């Protein structure tokens, strides 16, 4: 599981959903929650984000479009028959990506390269000690 420390910077809600903007350092990530919250007192609240290694999408160019696209450097690549594990350094944090080897083989990525990594807003979980925001 990938973990990032963040703080809430914005909350937009509809009847059943909320979109949270969170700051990870100077970068902004967005996540969707299946609950509504218009509480403005959540701003600047520290939170922990979590997402699975299988939800990390890699690209060797800035061609894909998603709300959560960042750059990182490739530390290690472990190619498997079915899946390849790629270890990234994003600022001071390690991000793990588990990518189908057939897909990974189409990319021009080597250890030491800078790549784009993405995770969809619906695939990020908000870890917290209490239920509800």
Regions found by a protein language model. Give the residues of each.
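Glycine/charge-rich catalytic "coupling/switch" loops of P-loop NTPases
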Residues: 2-5, 28, 35-71, 102-133
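Short, conserved beta-turn/loop elements at beta-strand boundaries and strand-helix junctions
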Residues: 11-17, 77-83
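A generic beta-sheet turn/junction motif
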Residues: 15, 24-26, 51, 81, ...
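Short, acidic/hydrophobic/Gly-rich beta-strand patch recurrent on exposed beta strands
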Residues: 19-25, 32, 85-91, 98
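Short leucine-rich amphipathic alpha-helices used at interfaces
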Residues: 33-34, 81
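Acidic- and glycine-rich mobile interface elements
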Residues: 89-109
């Amino acid at each position: 599981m990938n973990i990032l420390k963040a703080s809430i910077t914005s909350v937009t809600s509809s009847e059943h959903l909320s979109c949270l903007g969170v700051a990870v350092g100077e970068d902004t990530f967005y996540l969707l929650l299946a609950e509504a919250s218009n509480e403005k007192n959540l701003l600047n609240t520290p939170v922990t984000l979590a997402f699975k290694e299988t939800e990390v999408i890699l690209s060797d160019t800035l061609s894909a479009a998603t709300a959560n696209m960042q750059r990182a450097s490739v530390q290690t690549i472990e190619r498997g028959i079915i899946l390849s594990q790629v270890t990234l350094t994003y600022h001071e944090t390690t991000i793990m990506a588990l990518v189908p080897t057939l897909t990974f083989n189409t990319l021009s990525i080597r250890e030491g390269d800078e790549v784009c990594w993405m995770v969809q807003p619906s695939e990020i979980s908000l870890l917290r000690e209490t239920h509800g925001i």
